[in-house]
Amino acid sequence: MDIKEQIHGLTEEMLTNLGRLVAIDSQLGTPAEDKPFGEGPAKALEEGLKIAQELGFKTVNLDNYCGYAEMGEGDEIVGIAGHLDIVPVGGDWSYDPFKLTREGEDRKSTR
């Protein structure tokens, strides 16, 4: 099986996981002692790390400031940076900003 076939075989799982993350209102909130960016960003980080664990990664949450996932051992690693917080949600959305909308086979929409 080539890489394209492998990726295609994981499409539904990837979209399901993306939907799990999009459903979380991760706008900057009121800081709390253990949630420096508020409740929403902490929930998004927790869910993102949970998804990574489900995929077989070891995860680390750094006091809800950020987290990372890793796999394997050794001196050389590959790092991929991303974020789960979002800008404020206004009212000009064509679709629900907290739901992954599927439009046919090849188009997915969200915020």
Spans of features found by a protein language model:
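N-terminal helical capping/dimerization or prosegment-like subdomains
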Residues: 1-90
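Active-site metal-coordination/substrate-binding segment of hydrolases
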Residues: 77-111
